[in-house]
């Protein structure tokens, strides 16, 4: 539906009590400098879900009158029934802090029905703390630092989230806070502020392309969420033309500990494997994943392939490998190794292929860029087809 300016003026003049859309529950509101003054015509007292897209087409920040008009629209938004809200500016060049007070004001008016919030716009301490105390919040995509608390006054509760995304700039602040909340105690003996979230959280996404290390400290924070089914850690390793070290700092024992803690995983993405081949994890780390993560279907992980043939021979002597035969086979179908180097002569390809199939019998999709990985994938396909 496209409404011309003259029509919008008539709608405003003749607006009935309760507005033109009193029963509207879902609203996608694209705000520009051209339609800002009529955006309130589409607000409803019964809104449950709203997506706000702030479109600013210029390189310079929006002027005060734009922000004032936007604040007026937001203040008119009813939140009594609001359950879900997302707010996204279109222009990366805009200082998003300009919108902090405007959208913090609406968050502070959200009540117990509120369940989902997604926005890169920073929020005030008060607004963040308000979200933390909402009893039914189950989906939260965070793009900024957490609220600041004096050590003696950490929150005694945390929402029972099912899905948490920590975007760019959020991880370094939120991980320490989560560790503090897990270590704190509430009025009930043995219950921490994080107790409900530890049971409820199913999806955790960590998206930080600014050099976050995937190391034992960061993984230890994650391991308390033992019912996770989807864990994605998206970090950046330097490309072949860039200086810097691989950001994947886990070893085989760290992976084994993670696998034992997160046995419900169906998808595990630990960064995007890079070309450096300097990580401490070898193909041996796949064994505890296969043993303990009996529901896993997708895996992306850094592997050091320098001694891959010898590492596989050692796996064959590992008691855990013998244990695999008595366990339900791991349903993993996808293994992503991406830019990981692999240098194998033809005689070793079949050895490695057999070893991988022994660990992941259901593997069908092997994602590696090197020619040896592509050939290895063919060998694995042939082995699987030959056993059927």
What are these regions (language model features)?
Residues 1-388:
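Leucine-rich repeat
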